[in-house]
């Protein structure tokens, strides 16, 4: 490794440094007020995230995974039902389907935009299908207009997995507002990240909001009255105050990511690799900057030798995970090919062009041998 400073995948120290005093003041006030669960900070954040998405209601919860599970429960999806999910994404999407007793049906993805195709979804629909969960992978929205038209045609519910895409849009419409319910994650490395776990569900439907609020709180809509089996899944005030300190800067954070993506495109031009793309009208927020290349492993090794982080999202598609070995084998050739080619490079708003130039130099040197 050279004497150059290491470049991480995400620099949370740099991210939180300008907000430190504001966050500590907010945490001190929470300690003074001794209001830790379901308080004013959480309610304010719910309104802010719902407003960003363009819907009326937000319901905070303990994680993005819980957000998906709560959404499925609110839509009364359970044993005997099938839910269509992409195979090329984080396991939580399919995991949530299992948690409610339903069956995830894996669908292959497009190799340009990393999302399920309309044709692929339609081919997977059976009489048992109840919902579709499109994932806005890496910060790029899935084809929501097409998915919503297909869902309407077949009478299906739609849950958007927005974990990686807060602030992303299609023709000015925010993710989370297309489907019946949108689900967000506040894992620390996300575009809007907490100092721990957290999540949120958003919806335009007041009845779904009512269901979600009870389900996240032990199935209770009135203290000590428990109408259904629920969960202990609440976004605490400490995380909410941290997220609210960041929230006014989210657009700037996403702009910083898009700026870094532009620098990557400039410095990686002409190399034997595939850069991220976005359809016209799609606002990509670059949770990850993911390239495709045949020499993926060699490049990853070379970057590591120079103290530069990189990651493979994702090395094993969902349909090939051991936990689904009991299901009928699904063939998803695009996802299987992507798992051998994708490489995510450092991506965070504070990334500097000279850092990206250094990353590109290592990649160029490796590919040109």
From Swiss-Prot:
GO terms for molecular function: pyridoxal phosphate binding; transaminase activity. It is an enzyme of class 2 (transferase). Signal peptide: none annotated. Disulfide bonds: none annotated. It catalyses: UDP-2-acetamido-3-amino-2,3-dideoxy-alpha-D-glucopyranose + 2-oxoglutarate = UDP-2-acetamido-3-dehydro-2-deoxy-alpha-D-glucopyranose + L-glutamate. Belongs to the DegT/DnrJ/EryC1 family. Its EC number is 2.6.1.122. Keywords: Aminotransferase, Lipid A biosynthesis, Lipid biosynthesis, Lipid metabolism, Pyridoxal phosphate, Transferase. The lineage of its organism: Bacteria, Pseudomonadati, Pseudomonadota, Acidithiobacillia, Acidithiobacillales. Pathway: Bacterial outer membrane biogenesis; LPS lipid A biosynthesis. It comes from Acidithiobacillus ferrooxidans (strain ATCC 23270 / DSM 14882 / CIP 104768 / NCIMB 8455) (Ferrobacillus ferrooxidans (strain ATCC 23270)). Aminotranferase involved in the synthesis of 2,3-diamino-2,3-dideoxy-D-glucopyranose (GlcN3N), which is a component of lipid A in some species. Catalyzes the amination of UDP-2-acetamido-3-dehydro-2-deoxy-alpha-D-glucopyranose (UDP-3-oxo-GlcNAc) to UDP-2-acetamido-3-amino-2,3-dideoxy-alpha-D-glucopyranose (UDP-GlcNAc3N), using L-glutamate as the amine donor. Other amine donors, such as alanine and glutamine, can substitute for glutamate, but product formation is slower. One of its GO terms (biological process) is polysaccharide biosynthetic process. The keyword Lipid biosynthesis applies. This is UDP-N-acetyl-3-dehydro-alpha-D-glucosamine 3-aminotranferase.
